[in-house]
Amino acid sequence: MTKIKIVVIVGPTAVGKTALGISLAKAFNGEIISGDSQQVYRQLDVGTAKATQEEQAAAVHHLIDIREVTESYSAYEFVQDAQKAISDIVSRGKLPIIVGGTGLYLQSLLEGYHLGGQVDQEAVKAYRQELDQLSDQEVYELLQVKSITIKQLNRRRAIRALELSQFADDLENAETAYEPLIIGLNDDRQVIYDRINQRVDRMLENGLLEEAKWLYEHYPTVQASRGIGYKELFPYFVGEMTLAEASDQLKQNTRRFAKRQLTWFRNRMAVGFTAITAPDYPQVVHDRVRDFLGQKEKS
């Protein structure tokens, strides 16, 4: 079977994945698929670092704004949606370029997990509602009953593990249909941390506070509100923190998230990284893609 070539750009938040994706899309006749679990939500633009309207005009983007904030979204659904997007892009003679930082989503796609049959979404929803009625202790006890172990014990991870166990028969692990070129972006820790701090400041200047307040006032408990960028500002709205304190908390949590992303990509996906401050960084990446596609450099 001839595998479909795809380019996958990974790295910590704020490292510049979107800009590189657009650059590659322009150079290699590509279209971008968002691999970010938060960018699927409509009306959440600033806090999710969604590609701007100008950026989306520069290159076609898929899997952005495909869910309402009241809806949940899972790795299963991402794999389905990404497979459809890849098929669509390839059918038009273009290169699929996946850009994102949600490691579980990307790993699920690249390692060949797909839905063996149509998962009954109503059954998934009903099971999740059952779990929502349980206390934390009852959820953890259910993990033990099912002999499920997870590394970091918290309610959200526990429920995900229980759902995976419950619907495991609906999944197949098959040889992946894709040949990926994985491009990892990174740099010295302080460079990344400075970029994160600067981006949080820009987000606050560009409407993050208003976006977070709207989410807090209308949908404070939905899955989308748990993403980094929103929940850190909720204490400010009720007077438990000053804006400066909430901003610092957001920066700290984002830095921690970036560290977890890097750990995932190194340990789960064996990604090698390119320093974004290297003088030849853009050219090196473009050359890698050109070699991967078997293209000659234009004179």
Curated annotation (Swiss-Prot):
**Which ranges form a coiled coil?**
none
Binding positions (ATP)? G11, P12, T13, A14, V15, G16, K17, T18
Q: Source organism's superkingdom?
A: Bacteria
Record's keyword annotation contains Cell division: no
Q: Where is this region: Interaction with substrate tRNA?
A: 36-39
Which SUPFAM superfamilies does the UniProt record give?
A: P-loop containing nucleoside triphosphate hydrolases
Keywords, alphabetical: ATP-binding, Magnesium, Nucleotide-binding, Transferase, tRNA processing
Against Pfam families, the record matches this protein to: IPPT (PF01715)
Q: Which GO terms describe its biological process?
A: tRNA modification
Database matches in InterPro entries:
Dimethylallyltransferase, IPT, P-loop_NTPase
What does the entry list as the binding residues for substrate?
T13, A14, V15, G16, K17, T18
Query: For site (Interaction with substrate tRNA), what residue positions does UniProt give?
Result: T102
Query: Which spans are transmembrane here?
Result: none
Keyword Metal-binding listed? The answer is no
Q: Which cofactor does it need?
A: Mg(2+)
Q: What job does this protein perform?
A: Catalyzes the transfer of a dimethylallyl group onto the adenine at position 37 in tRNAs that read codons beginning with uridine, leading to the formation of N6-(dimethylallyl)adenosine (i(6)A).
Q: Which family does it belong to?
A: Belongs to the IPP transferase family.
NCBIfam families membership: miaA
Q: What is the protein's given name?
A: tRNA dimethylallyltransferase
**The species this protein was found in:** Streptococcus pyogenes serotype M4 (strain MGAS10750)
List the gene name: miaA
